[in-house]
Amino acid sequence: MIRIGTRGSKLALYQANKVAELLKNLGYKVEIKIIKTTGDRVLDKKLSDIGIGVFTKELDLAMLNNEIDIAVHSLKDIPTIWNENLMVGAVLERDSYHDLLIWNKDIDFNEDSKIVIGTSSMRRRAFLKFIYPNAKFELLRGNVDTRLRKLKEGLYDAIVLSEAGIIRLGVSLEDFNYKRLDILPAPAQGIIAVACKRDDEEMKSILKEINHERTYLESLCERTALNEFGGGCSVPFGALAVYDEKNELLKLKAAVVTNDELKNASGEVKCKIDEIDKAVELGKKIGLKLKN
């Protein structure tokens, strides 16, 4: 029996059940255990003010205490500098990496409008300042339903949500206007990750069976760039790696906002899909370029 740890939100349970189905299809028995995290309890602060690993710490501890065998996360929530006894054993194929700007149908605005945008993400806030320079940004926390309800009630003129979360939950946006934002996503946005203990050879072997190689390569490159730059989720950093399997070419674009200035960097490397050292090398190179 594989014990799967997860947070209790609808989105987290969707992700855990997706992993559970993949494992069941391979003949494994599974059970899901819900564990509440700091990020679920503290809803009145920015994530960057709460600390590192706000959605992972309690699940990490449960794994280390042998209460669960694996934990399912949104990969972007896992700190790039993590507990050395834990590792990402598998990632699933990436869903949409896009951010959506969503607003009520009776609101009309343009790039110069003084609108109130709800988001808890420092990256979204910093990048959107270049698109909507007169916008005011307000803290927005809670699950997807809660955020959309607050928008409908008029607490914000617009909010930003990840398209992946909307798709996974099957949420209808027919009551709203929305569009994809032309900004770089958070590193590993739209990717479901499965964590395990580094010394659990059996579980590592099992998770290899559900790992999506291209997504793993791309996410490793993006997260390495962030790690090299430093700062984790407290830094307005975006990155997107895309691997062209036909031409065996990995491309990375990254950007960061420092002192109200948007800095971009990009690069590419020829590599096979399993040459993760080259993905790490490219990530380090671009992260360093943005740092200096």
UniProtKB/Swiss-Prot annotation:
Alphabetized Pfam families for the sequence: Porphobil_deam, Porphobil_deamC
Pathway listed: Porphyrin-containing compound metabolism; protoporphyrin-IX biosynthesis; coproporphyrinogen-III from 5-aminolevulinate: step 2/4
Cofactor requirement: dipyrromethane
Cofactor note: Binds 1 dipyrromethane group covalently.
Modified residues (S-(dipyrrolylmethanemethyl)cysteine): C233
Single Gene Ontology MF annotation: hydroxymethylbilane synthase activity
Reactions catalysed, as given in the entry: 4 porphobilinogen + H2O = hydroxymethylbilane + 4 NH4(+)
Alphabetized InterPro entries for the sequence: HemC, Porphobilin_deaminase_cofac_BS, Porphobilin_deaminase_N, Porphobilinogen_deaminase_C, Porphobilinogen_deaminase_C_sf
GO cellular component: cytoplasm
Keywords assigned by UniProt, alphabetized: Porphyrin biosynthesis, Transferase
The protein's Enzyme Commission number: 2.5.1.61
SUPFAM superfamilies found in the cross-reference section: Periplasmic binding protein-like II, Porphobilinogen deaminase (hydroxymethylbilane synthase), C-terminal domain
Domain of life: Archaea
Known role: Tetrapolymerization of the monopyrrole PBG into the hydroxymethylbilane pre-uroporphyrinogen in several discrete steps.
Note: The porphobilinogen subunits are added to the dipyrromethane group.
Family: Belongs to the HMBS family.
Listed name of the protein: Probable porphobilinogen deaminase
Species whose genome carries this gene: Methanocaldococcus jannaschii (strain ATCC 43067 / DSM 2661 / JAL-1 / JCM 10045 / NBRC 100440) (Methanococcus jannaschii)
